[in-house]
């Protein structure tokens, strides 16, 4: 089997079994929230020094389920890309930076994902290496991630559309989990959702309404300076969110 490699900085990792992990953390108390906010800068070096990680991102979130321009000082997340699910799980359990996040937070949830498809760029690269199509069942639980750098002149127009889209997602009984995240408030945005199968995900994407209209406006108005759309097979999850097992 041909082994593909992905390079970032000085790191070169096998990605034949690439795993993407999104770790969510909820904080309570002013000092814990201040610590979490500070880690948006300070945790970068710690994550960069973990040689098994080929790509990472730190996120804040919006109020509610994250799909608002108003920051939620309680919820933060880390996205990390690994070359093996066992290495990822062991590292997240044992590495100091993850231990500190767990110690400071009141709850945390980690979802392990295998890329199925990925189109576009994130900081001028595509960090996700998809599985072969035959390795994915249409009936398996899937996740969708979209990220975009919003052009400054479009920011107000973009955020005026978000409440209607958020309401549609929230009312969809098929969505198992959804969260809006941000690298840089208002400008670098990420949406993440989990669906029971490919059909449910596709039905939402094709449905007429605010979501479809927003996509049309994005394409016609060239709203984003950079964007990426990815789908994943959900492999497993560890921890709880809102006091319960999500999937």
Segment roles from a protein language model:
Residues 224:
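An exposed tryptophan-centered "aromatic clamp" motif
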Residues 79:
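Short beta-strand-to-loop acidic/aromatic patch adjacent to the donor-nucleotide binding site
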């Amino acid at each position: 089997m041909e082994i593909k490699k992905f390079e970032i900085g000085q790191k070169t990792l096998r990605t034949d079994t690439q795993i993407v992990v999104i770790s969510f953390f909820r904080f309570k108390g002013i000092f814990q929230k201040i610590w979490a906010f500070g880690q948006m800068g300070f945790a970068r070096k710690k994550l960069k020094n973990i040689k098994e990680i080929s790509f990472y991102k730190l996120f804040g979130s919006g109020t509610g389920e994250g799909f608002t321009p108003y920051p939620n000082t309680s919820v933060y997340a880390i996205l990390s890309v690994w070359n093996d699910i066992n290495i990822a799980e062991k590292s997240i359990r044992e590495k100091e930076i993850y231990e500190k996040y767990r110690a400071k937070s009141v709850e945390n949830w980690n979802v392990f994902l295998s890329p199925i498809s990925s189109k576009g760029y994130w900081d001028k690269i595509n960090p996700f290496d998809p599985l072969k199509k035959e390795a994915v069942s249409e009936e398996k639980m899937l996740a969708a991630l979209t990220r975009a750098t919003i052009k400054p002149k479009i920011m107000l127009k973009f955020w005026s559309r978000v409440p209607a889209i958020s309401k549609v997602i929230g009312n969809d009984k098929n969505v198992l989990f959804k969260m809006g995240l941000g690298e840089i408030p208002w400008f670098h945005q990420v949406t993440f959702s989990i669906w029971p199968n490919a059909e449910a995900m596709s039905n939402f994407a094709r449905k007429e309404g605010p979501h479809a209209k927003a996509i049309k406006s994005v394409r016609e108005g060239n709203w984003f300076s950079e964007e990426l759309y990815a789908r994943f097979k959900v492999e497993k999850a560890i921890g709880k969110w809102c006091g319960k097992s999500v999937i």
